Amino acid sequence: MCGIVGYTGERDAAPIIVDSLVRLEYRGYDSAGVATIHEGRLYLEKDAGKLTEGGEPTKLQRSLRKLPGKIGIGHTRWATHGDPNRRNAHPHTDCRDEIAVVHNGIIENFMQLREELEDKGHRFDSETDTEVVPHLIEQGMKEGKSFFEAFVEAVRRLEGSYAIAAICTREPDVILAARKESPLVVGLGDDGNFLASDIPAILPETNRVIPIDDGEIVVVKRDEVRILDAETLEDVTEEKEVQIVEEDPHTLERRGYPHFMLKEIHEQPEAVRNTLRIERENLMEMAEELVGGDYTKLYIVACGTSYHAGLGAKYATELLAKFPVDVVIASEFRYVTKELVDENTLVLAISQSGETADTLAAVREANARGATTIALTNVVGSTITREVDHVMYTHAGFEKAVAATKTYTAQLAAMYTLAVELARHFGEITNKEAEEYHAELNKVPEMLEEVLSWEREREIAVMGGRYKERPNWFFIGRGPGYPTAMEGALKLKEITYQHAEAYPAGELKHGPLALIEEGVPVVAVAQPGGVYEKMLANIEEVKARGATVITVADEKDEAVEEHSDHVIRVPSISEVFSPIVYTVPLQLLAYYMSVARGIDPDYPRNLAKSVTVE
């Protein structure tokens, strides 16, 4: 959830590090800092606050840029231990201000280490777990070890998760780093080398990256990078593959849109088109291989928006392939569901970033029990891709806004394709039917372009402004419409800070109906199909109790008009695939309401794009 950046090379380090940290803002943070070395002295600046406000540099950013030196490390912090203030911001230093450290993750045994170090005379200034690391290194160097030897010894004593980077004035030409269960990549540049938590941070500087694996230590110099096994210190550099990132760095820019979220909403037709075009052959081969196995069940594990995509995939897979699917919140999977996993189990893990801590933990549990694991992610080379048996990619391009949009619809596109191919190979549908389903999916980008036409978007924008002060929202749906309702409610609460809940419409009488009164907004997802008539009855039910009803419905639906205050029309699509189209108006509704409420939808409070701690 925090961000790490390091640079050593021929240019001034601080501006490069700060620009990279700005590109990591989507991860969420409450403070930032940079440390550099110049002429044998450590320079450090840090504080609580943001690096940008309204797209403009803050006072904190301007002060960080002024630090001298050709080597440095930087950090954006999301508070886990200690309040968000200057004292707790990273980098942290030792007693002599010779060593600076930045860290992502949680050090579980930090209190024990802190007490031990305090007994040896070390003084601590913060409440953080991270501060034990520079003091451990300092203690090792006091005992005669080199910076490298002391760093290795310190890392070996840490329990928990971490990505760590350190610099030292006694060896001012090297950055040392280590990783355990927290993402870290090395970037290879022409005039220096880089470290970062995420590839987007350094993409404008270099597209040549090496993902670091758990249990590895990295030695970064301006003209050399070495990667070592943390236990044996064996040099494994030659075994590492340099990946060339094809992503256009301009995708990290707003390109005329007021916010990244709106830009990414409008990029959905292309994201879906690319995913269907590039990934189809891989998915067809995967389906054929999976059907040939002796599998009895499929678990989909995910968090947040990816969980809702998993629910959409469940409906499609069960309806088309007649194969049982359970969708489990990743953080819950390890506690109960894992006991049901064996070698006859498929586990599909969905993670936009490929670094979600709870999802990775679920994958590791599944692997340990002999399951066949599959990942669906947007990031090539991410941790999850290296820990599973099969990989599916969404080809959505980098997504910067915290609230996921284009990766959600791209996830659905990939999993719908897989569901069709599973159904074909299981013999549940004919080849002709499979091709008809694929043809319909290929029309989805055009459908999304219709939904995103200015006329329709303007109607939703007006609606968002009109209802911006309604404090409680309900979203209802049936069948495939229920995960759409869940995603709509999540988007609204994420970026408008209004209370929103989603329910299966059939559950209204079992409690939620007590909360429906005059003026309460109810968003109804009313796709045509087997549940439509019952959904219409549910809409009448809430309308009779005074609710303001906003219905997302097929463009040909005439019956819904008289029961709704507003109808958002979408192109006709099969019920089984409806979430991929019906969700987009709800993204727009949340976006425009957020803007009307004066909230930055790209960076909602308390949330991070990539949740890398449990």
From Swiss-Prot:
The lineage of its organism: Archaea, Methanobacteriati, Methanobacteriota, Methanomada group, Methanopyri. PANTHER family: GLUCOSAMINE--FRUCTOSE-6-PHOSPHATE AMINOTRANSFERASE, ISOMERIZING, GLUTAMINE--FRUCTOSE-6-PHOSPHATE TRANSAMINASE (ISOMERIZING). It holds the Pfam family GATase_6. Residues 286-428, 463-604 form the SIS domain. Homodimer. The gene is glmS. It comes from the Archaea. One of its GO terms (biological process) is protein N-linked glycosylation. Residues 2-223 form the Glutamine amidotransferase type-2 domain. This is Glutamine--fructose-6-phosphate aminotransferase [isomerizing]. The active site is at 2 (nucleophile), 609 (for fru-6p isomerization activity). GO terms for cellular component: cytoplasm. SUPFAM superfamilies: N-terminal nucleophile aminohydrolases (Ntn hydrolases), SIS domain. Catalyzes the first step in hexosamine metabolism, converting fructose-6P into glucosamine-6P using glutamine as a nitrogen source. Its EC number is 2.6.1.16. It is found in: Cytoplasm. It catalyses: D-fructose 6-phosphate + L-glutamine = D-glucosamine 6-phosphate + L-glutamate. One of its GO terms (molecular function) is carbohydrate derivative binding. InterPro entries: GATase_2_dom (IPR017932), GFAT (IPR005855), GFAT_N (IPR047084), GlmS/AgaS_SIS (IPR035466), GlmS/FrlB_SIS (IPR035490), Ntn_hydrolases_N (IPR029055), SIS_dom (IPR001347), SIS_dom_sf (IPR046348). It is an enzyme of class 2 (transferase). Keywords: Aminotransferase, Cytoplasm, Glutamine amidotransferase, Repeat, Transferase.
